[in-house]
Amino acid sequence: MAPSNTTITLTRALTRDQQARRERLVRAALDLAAEGGYASVTMHDVADRAGVARATVYRYFTSNDHLLSEVSALWIGQVIDELTSRRLPAEPAESLTAMLCRLVQVSAEHRLLTEAILQAATSPDPSAEASHENFQGSLGRILDTALGTPDTPEAQARMADLQHVLGHVLLSGLLGLSHRGRSSEEVQDLMRTAVRLVM
């Protein structure tokens, strides 16, 4: 018997229709966040935009922060796909700098969406933890693309350290961009400095 303070979560695979409905909800939330920021992503408005009953939204997501964590995964995945498909400088530090600066540019171009995703990622809601994990995983993809996949335990440890440090610098820069009125150029300069110092 499980101790009384243990939480057990059961999951089941979604049918094709359920998966399509869930994706439609995430797309609706992404559109609302892009149009009006965090405050625009209410469960009621997401349901209306997706053309489903409000109860349907709660069947898939526990809160708007949970929903925005999925928006984060979708949007950041699309941005990283675009970054990794670009022609990059051959030198690893230059390649890393180019990718991080482009990520800042895209975030500035979609400031309301960036603000919504960051607000969810820094929320105390436990269901939004996936947002932070998505952010770190995306940074890992950037590092792998720019620097190559590490092949020794020492290189893997160094890559983990780089991911941790650059992740904090990037998060701080994006919060400055979306919440404190910093310009895209200021945040790009911050990323250039960070890469120069850690590389």
Feature names for model-found ranges:
Residues 98, 105-141, 153-154, 175-176:
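Short secondary-structure transition hinges
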Residues 1-36, 40-49, 66-69, 74:
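Basic, helix-initiating cap at the start of DNA-binding domains
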Residues 51-61:
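Short hydrophobic/aromatic patch on the recognition helix
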Residues 25-33, 79, 103, 170:
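Short hydrophobic clusters on alpha-helical segments that form packing/core surfaces
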Residues 21, 64, 71, 75, ...:
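Hydrophobic/aromatic residues within well-ordered alpha-helical segments
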Residues 70, 84-109, 163, 188:
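Hydrophobic alpha-helical connector segments
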Residues 80, 125-168, 185-196:
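Amphipathic alpha-helical packing segments from all-alpha helical-bundle domains
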